[in-house]
Amino acid sequence: MPIPYKQVTCATILTMVHYKIQVNGIVQGVGFRPFVYALATGNNCKGSVINNTEGVTIHLEGDDQSIQQCIDAIKNSPPPLAKIIDIRITKLPLNGYTAFTIEESQITTCKDTFIPPDVAICNECHDEFFDSTNRRYHYPFTTCTHCGPRFSIIDDIPYDRATTSMRSFPMCSNCLAEYRNPLNRRFHTQPNACSVCGPEYRLCDSSGKTILTQFDAIMEQVKALLKDHIVAIKSVGGYHLACDARSDRCVTLLRERKNRPFKPFAIMVSSIEFLETFCSVTAREKELLQSRERPIVLIKLNKTIFSTHVAPHLTYIGVMLPYTPFQYMLFHNNRESIYIMTSANIADEPIIYKDNDAFERLHTIVDYFVTYNREIIAHTDDSVMYVVDEHPFFVRRSRGYVPAPLFIKKTPLHILATGGDLKNSFALARNNFVIVSQYLGDLSTPWGNDLYRKTIAHFSKIFDFKPALVVSDMHPGYFTTLFAHELEEHGVQTIATQHHHAHIASVCQEHGISQPVIGIAYDGTGYGTDHTLWGSEFLIADTTTFTRAAHFDYFKLPGGEHAINNPWKIGLSLLQCTGIDSNNFFTNEKEKFLVEEIIQKNINCPLTCSIGRLFDGVAALLGLAHHISTEAEAAMLLEEEALKAYSDTCVLSIPISNSMPYGINTTWLVQEIVSMMDKGIAPATIAMRFHRAIADVTVRVALMLREQFKIHSVALSGGVFHNRILLHCIVEGLRKNRFDVYTPLQLPCNDGGIALGQIAIGRDTYNGH
């Protein structure tokens, strides 16, 4: 019978015994079988280890002390990339094993194992790559048990070469000898390859015609090309667009060709040491930058030593370090190079990762392609993170982190959460775990919709998933909602959730909170139960129900979503709502009088209380952004302006209504802003006072709700909390008033995190029935 791990001690394992050990978790593709082999042979144990669709199964036969040492090491010192979730130990009759062997993988009835994320090249492989005496010198696919691609090349489990895109590359005799040698770091490493037998790079022109195939020649040519040209480079999870970040011409050309006037580009640099010559890097940021996950990290600039067009008007810039041999070669003998390294995508779509798609869709943007002949099976954008008060937060959770599982209270059925339509990630729940997908971008195009369907199908295959319940957003126009309806037509149960409730439920689920919280959801939009556009929500919520307790007052959104790209229209609406004369505002906008008439006659002017839209409108009033080209551009510029006057501590006390749901007086706030402008107060000071006013009223409303509902826990979520000033001031204010404050840590606070909340609501609603 199974024996719980904690009960297995030296006293319970007898001399010459046989135990079956079933290990579940991230245990395939991480060197787990070679690790067990070394343990067993080192402790004179006989038996076997095998990958199967349930994880790893070990049979150990030997004396009690030796087996105990093996079990302790499996639990306490697994391989670096492994994550053990469960160990089940069963005592069996002696089998009479004569050796310890690694068996061929099995397919069993249930797929109950996890797939490791892609990680950066390890130090040992890095050193071999640059060692001229090593047979992998300058071989760009150098990898081992502890590093390199995993998720992006796996087509199915169990994890073997035949179920990865390495199946097209039979190992040469030298690689096969390493693969079969238990003492070698590449023992049973499925992506194992070298220049004789492995994948190869090639340099192509913009039409896809091959120019070069020899790697060192390619690298020399690419380094030269990047000075004056835009190059698409195939990386681990898709293509990057790259160019010299110091070149005004190149960066401007990239913006023109990609139709990306403002949105900042990420850069890649050679090292922390070089980065510190122009940025302030905290210890926590260094840790993230150098981690095996290698995310992009938003770092504070001290001085600009590259083109001002890389991240115009912004204090923080996205930075990453090399994570593949190819990328390290870009900086070889050129340590002070700075390259733009941005996802090759079209207007917020997912990253392009198929070669044919790259040649077809990027040829008008790039001058050259650097590609290779190994297929990317699962695309992954670079993850993006930032640090506030030494706590790391996700903007985008993808490469390096997906598809690592999150653990939850057990669900009785398979649940699919479709996520939102912006910054989409979906989620699958089965048993006691959730797999949140990689970043899929915005689902507003046929390309995005098609990839969404394909990615769900891929996840369903590799995780043996068939949804019995689908949870979606309640917005009737979302693609994800329509997708849920399609499944409903095939007999699958569906539940629709309110957007901001899902935001808060996600935080509750992540932190294991079962009691109601004061949930504060600040974002750009979300379909409300009253059919208006919410976005400044104070909810008394758990993972089944919510009560709307407070919000900012409504104002009109002239032209609906078209106003989002024209913040001046929102600013004009705020003036109209307050009765302030708009004659001195937006005088250069040709449509001004037409928009005023639309507002006055209430033609296509949906109501919103969104904090995100309020930020847009205030940025427009201060003259910072009349028109924008990317989401949150106006809000980012308003935050940047506020940073110039961060030392200003004046707090405007926004009035709050007396009855629930409490109304926060937006009109009063706009009047105060215009009054300060009339007095000649600097825009930076007004911007900072606006931030402090939002933080102050947030804390005051939370205090009112604590008094009324006797709740001391606050959950914060929504994309507006990417604002560093607002997050810091609100968290600081709440903690000073002895609230327990919870924020998303394992997922983004934006819509990339709501699928987990949808899972929690779906599970607990189903269990309640």
Regions found by a protein language model. Name each.
Residues 163, 178, 334-409, 608:
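Internal gly/pro-rich beta-alpha loop/helix module
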Residues 191, 198-200, 420-458, 573-711, ...:
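A contiguous, well-structured pocket-lining segment that forms one wall/lid of small-molecule binding clefts
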Residues 4-7, 12-191, 195, 202:
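Intrinsically disordered, low-complexity, mixed-charge
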Residues 232, 464-476, 709-720:
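Short glycine-rich phosphate-binding loop at a beta-alpha junction
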Residues 473, 491-503, 712-717, 724, ...:
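Conserved phosphate-binding/catalytic loops in two-lobed NTP-binding clefts
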Residues 91, 230, 238-301:
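A phosphate-binding glycine/aspartate-rich beta-alpha loop in the early core of alpha/beta enzymes
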Residues 500-522, 526-528, 567-576, 742-769:
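Glycine-rich phosphate-binding/hydrolytic loop that grips phosphoryl groups
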Residues 276-281, 329, 351-358, 382-383, ...:
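Conserved phosphate-binding catalytic cores of ATP/NTP-utilizing and phosphoryl-transfer enzymes
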